[in-house]
Amino acid sequence: VDASEWTYTTGQIKEAFFKTEGKVQRALILAGTRVDGRQPDELRALNSEVDILPRTHGSAIFQRGETQALVTATLGTPRDMPIIDGLCDEYKKPFFMHYNFPPFSTGEIKPLRGPSRRDIGHGELAEKSLRAVMPATDQFPYTVRLVADLMESNGSTSQAATTGGSLALMAAGVPI
């Protein structure tokens, strides 16, 4: 069929898709299953391992279903603290986290051009969560850098980065 013979508008196609999607979701709910085949009360499989990278201070891999994060912890001296120059006065940051969500983790082929808004936002979310359990600098006078590399993604990537981060911190000997 030649595309010029189609009589449906883009709006009509979107509306039909939306209605079909609603019917499928309703059928799944009534059948008591999720899109991936799990029952409503069934959790995704969990797996974790620490110290998988021998040359880092701490490392962990955390997997929940088809989402996997490889997180490394590196310890430095107080002189290694990055100086943050924002809208207010400069300050030093004893704990910081980088979150990398490369295209291959979702099966996409895109160029890597630095962190995206998503990378920055999810990294801030995970960093804020973990900062709450970090020891005070007078008790633990080190700079701590976490790097979370998402290896696979099927949802809950910031949760995987946060959980993997806590495991990597413990593997590095950080008293959280």
Indicate residue ranges for each PLM-predicted region.
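A short glycine/serine-rich beta->alpha loop
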Residues: P111-S116, A148-S156
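Glycine-rich, flexible beta-strand/loop modules in the N-terminal catalytic cores of phosphate-handling
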Residues: I52, H57-Y142
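Amphipathic alpha-helical transducer elements in NTP-driven molecular machines
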Residues: G123, Q159-T162
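Mobile "lid/hinge" segments at catalytic clefts and subdomain interfaces of large enzymes
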Residues: L169-I176
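Short helix-coil transition sites and intra-membrane helix breaks within transmembrane domains
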Residues: A136, N154-Q159
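Extended amphipathic alpha-helical scaffolds
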Residues: V1-Y91
